[in-house]
Design a protein with these regions (language model features):
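Active-site-adjacent beta->alpha loops and helix N-cap segments on the catalytic face
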Residues: 1-6, 25-27, 53-65, 84-90, ...
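Conserved N-terminal beta1-alpha1 strand-loop-helix module at the mouth
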Residues: 1-47
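Active-site mouth loops of central-metabolism enzymes
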Residues: 13-29, 74-86, 142-160, 237-251
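Conserved, mostly hydrophobic/aromatic
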Residues: 17, 45, 95, 168, ...
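Active-site beta-loop-alpha junctions enriched in small/polar residues
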Residues: 18-21, 48-52, 77-83, 108-109, ...
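Active-site pocket-lining/capping segments in soluble small-molecule metabolic enzymes
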Residues: 121-148, 196-250, 255, 286-303
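Active-site/ligand-binding-proximal alpha/beta "capping" segment
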Residues: 132-177, 251-263
Length: 303
């Protein structure tokens, strides 16, 4: 089943992101996480690449198992960094041969410590990868792309950033998943601009529950997400109390999701950081909202 078809059939699409363990860590660890996530009945699970494709060999394997072992639709991340057309074709062929026909096309991050000195590969930007995939595989695959409600960290012009996003959609992207954010109002303004720009593919909202002090420092460094005062107060209050910070982070993410569902978003994509217990808590918190989402006329419909 293609993810674009899931968006057409369901009022609210609920999904998770996981990442492969480092190559020094046994794969069994991620399957323990998946055992728990399966019971939460996500509509699909995405599987990331490491920086510079550092878990490249593990991503297709796990994506295949999500689909065939766990019976959950799988979205395999594919990045441009150091990727050749030949390598990309091999990966996509493996995925298609094993029932995975959903790909999230991303530029990706350079290998750690090699931001200014690495082999770029055959695709410079995500749009180049999207064009290649669509021309090569046509409608046999469903292609997702990334959207940046606060603009890409490397682009300081939001209008230009939106123009690039529109081009990416025109090149063949079927749906979008947003970068994480902590201020819903910024997202709503982004949605208004996207509508005006004619971006009409489904947009799923990326939400990351912040449950540790180190996590937020990495987030701000990597993606530049702005922190509203409400969020900053939580960090200051509970930064030195790990259990309290986790509880507050789960509550904050839940509050974001409740508001986003009320706004009428098409999807919620939870960045789990492989913490199944956090995903379970949030899923439980919004279970009633998932089961019956009000349509614009106020009537309840199954999600």
């Amino acid at each position: 089943l293609k993810i674009k078809d899931i968006f057409e059939k369901k009022r609210l699409v609920f999904s998770f992101e996981i990442f492969p363990p480092k190559t020094t860590t046994p794969l069994e660890r991620i399957y323990e996480t998946l055992d728990e996530l399966k019971g939460l009945q996500p509509d699909f699970i995405s599987v990331t690449y490491g920086a510079g494709g550092s878990t490249r060999d593990r991503t297709p394997q796990i994506a295949m198992d999500v689909k065939n072992k766990y019976g959950i639709e799988s979205l395999a991340h594919l990045t441009c960094v150091e990727a050749t057309r030949e390598d990309t074709e091999k990966i996509v062929s493996f995925l298609l041969d094993n029932g995975v026909n959903n790909i999230l096309a991303l530029r990706g991050d350079p290998p750690e410590g090699a931001r200014d000195n690495f082999v770029k590969g055959d695709f410079e930007h995500a749009i180049d990868l999207v064009r290649f995939l669509r021309e090569k595989y046509g409608e046999t695959i469903s292609i997702g792309g990334a959207a940046y409600p606060e603009g890409h960290i490397e682009c300081d012009d939001p209008i230009k950033d939106l123009h690039f996003l529109k081009q990416k959609v025109n090149a063949g992207v079927d749906f979008l998943i947003t970068q994480l954010f902590f201020d819903n109002e910024l997202f709503y303004r982004f949605m208004e601009r996207a509508y005006i720009a004619g971006i009409n593919v489904p947009i799923s909202v990326g939400i990351m529950p912040v449950v540790s002090k180190n996590q937020i420092e990495r987030i701000v460094t990597l993606c530049g997400a702005s922190l509203p005062q409400k969020f900053v107060r939580i960090l200051h209050r509970y930064a030195d109390d790990p259990r309290a910070l986790e509880e507050a982070g789960i509550a904050y993410a839940t509050d974001q999701i409740v508001d986003l569902i009320a706004f009428g978003v098409k999807g919620i994509h939870l960045y789990t950081m492989n913490k199944a217990h956090v995903a379970r808590r949030i899923t439980s918190n919004i279970s009633t909202l998932r089961e019956a989402v009000p349509d614009p006329k106020g009537e309840k419909v199954l999600s």
